[in-house]
C-alpha cells in the first residue's frame, strides 16, 4: 500500500516497510502552485507502517519548472506516440446484450478523433464530445467504466473525454436494474455478480464493433469504477467477496443510506451467479470504492496494478472500512483528498444539475470539483500510461 494525501499544510506518505516500490510519489504528485516541498523532516512507526512527513515552502523557480513540465507532458500527449492530432473526442453508442437477461444494455464509447469536437447536450449533461467525428487512425488502449449505484454511463463523462483526448478509448455502460431510472435490482446477486459480466460483455462488444475493433490495443485494457463500480472492478480483478460482511458493516453505519437501505441484506435472486474475473483487464482505478465486502483473503488473488482515490469526508462510505482497508490489504496506491466527499468524483455539475440534483452537486466550502478533476484526470492518465508501458 502507498497512501498519498493531496497537499495540505503537511503531507503524510505511508508505505509498508516490506514494499518494493520506491518513493516515487514524492516526485510525482501535482502540488498547488503556491508551494513546493522543502524536504522530509520526520518518521513515525505505527502499525508496521512507516509514515514520512514533509514540509513545504514557496519556491517560484521550481513552480515555474513544474508548470513547464506539465505543459511539456500535455504537449507530448497531444502529439501522441503516433504523432497524430487527437484533441477531438467522438462518441458512439455500442450494441451490447446484457448477459443477465439478454436484453439490450445502454453503452457508449468515447474515442480519440482528429476532427473538431463540440459540446453535446445529453439530458442534464454537457458532454465535450461529438457524434459526427470519426475515430483516429491508430491503435488505442481501452478503459471500461462502471458507475456507482443508481448512476449512468454519463456520470463520469469529463474523465472519459479527458482520457480520450490523451489517446484512450473509453467504454461506459449503464448497468441494468442499478441506475438512475431503475434501481430495482440494487443490492441483489444479479447486480453484484451481474455487473462484472456486463462489463465483460461491453468489452467483447467493443472488440467486435465495426468502428472500434481495428483501433483497440487488446493488450492494454483497463478499468475505472466509482463506488459500487469499485466492487465491480475488484471482482473483475479476481477478488472474492463475502456478502455477509455488508450486513455487519451496515449494523455499524446505518446512516450510509444508499448502500445500507436494506440494512446490508443481499437478495439472492440469481443464486447460480458467482464472482467472475476477466483476465483481459490488466489495470484498475477505483474512485471511492465500496470494498468492505472483501476480506484480506478474498483480495489475495488480485495482482493487477491498482490505484485508489477517496475523499476523507466521504459520508456515504466509510473511507477507513473501504478504500483505506482495501489499500492495506493489497499493493494498491491510495490517494486521499482532504475535505472531499463521495460525490466529488462525479463529473462537475451543469447549472441544470445544480438546480435539480443538489445532493450530488453540493461541496464543502473550499472544495473545487473542477480543479480536483483536472488533477486526478492527469494522475489517472499517468497511472494507465505507466501500467501499460506507454512512453
Question: Which stretches of residues belong to each language-model region?
Answer:
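Alpha/beta-hydrolase active-site loop
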Residues: 189-214, 252-253
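Short beta-strand/loop motif that positions the catalytic acidic residue
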Residues: 308-310
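Short alpha-helix in the alpha/beta-hydrolase fold that links the catalytic acid
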Residues: 318-327
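Cap/lid segment of the alpha/beta-hydrolase catalytic domain
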Residues: 150, 154, 174-194, 205, ...
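Alpha/beta-hydrolase fold nucleophile elbow
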Residues: 215-225
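Short substrate-entry loop that stabilizes the transition state in hydrolases
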Residues: 133-136, 140, 145, 149-182, ...
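Domain-level recognition of soluble alpha/beta enzyme cores
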Residues: 84-144
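Short glycine-enriched nucleophile-adjacent loop
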Residues: 207, 230-242
